Regions:
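A short, sequence-level motif marking secondary-structure junctions
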Residues: 3, 58-61, 132-136, 157-160
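Structural recognition of beta-strand segments within beta-rich domains
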Residues: 46-47, 148
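Bacterial Sec-dependent N-terminal signal peptides
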Residues: 1-40
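Short beta-strand segments and strand-loop junctions that repeat across beta-rich extracellular domains
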Residues: 36-41, 70, 146-150
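Acidic, glycine-rich flexible loop segments
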Residues: 118-135, 140-143
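Short beta-turn/strand-loop junction motif enriched in small, turn-promoting residues
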Residues: 51-52, 143-145
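Edge beta-strand at a domain terminus
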Residues: 137, 145-160
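Central antiparallel beta-sheet cores of small beta-barrel/beta-sandwich binding domains
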Residues: 42, 48-50, 54-120, 126-127, ...
Length: 160
């Protein structure tokens, strides 16, 4: 009998040990998924000045962003705000809501995106763009050069 008692204890210990391992693996997997979702660039982001919300979405390998909300959605004449500063006169009738202002960004690894462009409807200019997700903040860098040396960084904030 003492032999079977030790065997049963060993089996019980092994079962509990295996359960702990499975629990640890499942916990790590769930944590990893939660962290990756929290670090995802996809979603809605409010600009640092609070004047607009941009929805970032994935299309194939590219990440793009369109304006989905404006603090001032209408022009002074009461019509929907338009792309009045666009250098191409034909595009000045485009409505700002729905306008893509981020385009062609590629996932560079981790929480970084780059090699894209950002359009500023305020001045009608397009700049090189890179982004980095830091929790609920999206650090967006627009620059004159592809390396991002000559430019500025804006912090956008995730909208729940």
């Amino acid at each position: 009998m003492p032999f079977t008692d030790k065997t049963n204890k060993r089996k019980t210990f092994n079962i509990i040990s295996n359960m702990k391992k499975y629990f640890l693996v499942i916990t790590l997997a769930i944590t990893s998924v939660c962290i990756s979702l929290a670090q995802s660039v996809i979603g809605k982001w409010k600009l640092d000045d609070g004047t607009a919300i941009v929805e970032v979405y994935q299309e194939g390998d590219n990440f793009n962003g369109r304006i989905v909300w404006l603090e001032e959605p209408n022009d002074p004449d009461g019509t929907p705000a338009k792309d009045n500063n666009n250098p191409d006169e034909k595009l000045r009738t485009r409505q700002l809501i729905g306008l893509n202002m981020l385009s062609g960004l590629k996932h560079k690894g981790g929480n970084e995106y780059g090699n894209g462009s950002i359009y500023d409807p305020g001045n009608g200019k397009t700049y090189n763009c890179s982004m980095k997700v830091e929790g609920n903040t999206l650090r967006v860098r627009g620059s004159l050069d592809k390396r991002g040396i000559l430019g500025r960084t804006m912090d956008w904030f995730r909208v729940k």
